[in-house]
């Protein structure tokens, strides 16, 4: 993956978000997200997957782990915003990631509407979409892209 400049990556992400009609700053592929994290020292990756997913599927080194929903009930975390504000500066560039990009989209929308001006969604998420055999980790996603992760 060719390393773009931070401003190139962020303007591409912003253009993508506008094309998709997203209310937050931008949408990045996993590879672009990793580049942004390398180029912007204050940037934070917020992994909103459940504890179970982190423990059983894998974690990203250095990510802020903050459940959007809890397993097994999948109830929304009522303290999400308070926990986010406690752990991540509202001025920071914040990248939200989940399994496939759906919960992280919701988290980015909430954060963006709550004073976080630089919210980005990691498209494809950690595991990517299901393939023709209904399995993940083969089409897109952080892990499939060969980016750093470790077993929970």
Each model region followed by its residue ranges:
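Rhodanese-like catalytic fold shared by cysteine-dependent sulfurtransferases
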Residues: 2-43, 51-93, 104-152
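Conserved G/P- and acidic residue-centered "switch" motifs that form tight phosphate/ATP-binding loops
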Residues: 47, 101
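Short, surface-exposed ligand- or partner-binding patches at beta-edge/loop junctions that are enriched
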Residues: 96-97
């Amino acid at each position: 993956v060719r390393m773009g400049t931070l401003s190139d990556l962020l303007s591409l992400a912003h253009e993508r978000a506008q094309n998709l009609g997203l209310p937050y700053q931008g949408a990045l592929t996993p590879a672009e997200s990793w580049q942004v994290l390398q180029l912007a020292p204050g940037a934070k990756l917020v992994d909103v997957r459940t504890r179970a997913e982190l423990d059983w599927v894998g974690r990203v080194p250095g990510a802020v782990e903050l459940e959007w929903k809890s397993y097994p009930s999948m109830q929304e975390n009522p303290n999400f915003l308070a926990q986010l504000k406690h752990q991540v500066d509202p001025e920071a560039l914040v990248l939200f990631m989940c399994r496939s990009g759906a919960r992280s989209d919701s988290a980015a929308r909430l954060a963006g509407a709550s004073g976080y001006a630089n919210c980005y969604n990691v498209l494809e998420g950690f595991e990517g979409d299901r393939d023709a055999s209904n399995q993940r980790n083969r089409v897109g996603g952080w892990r499939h892209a060969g980016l750093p992760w470790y077993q929970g």
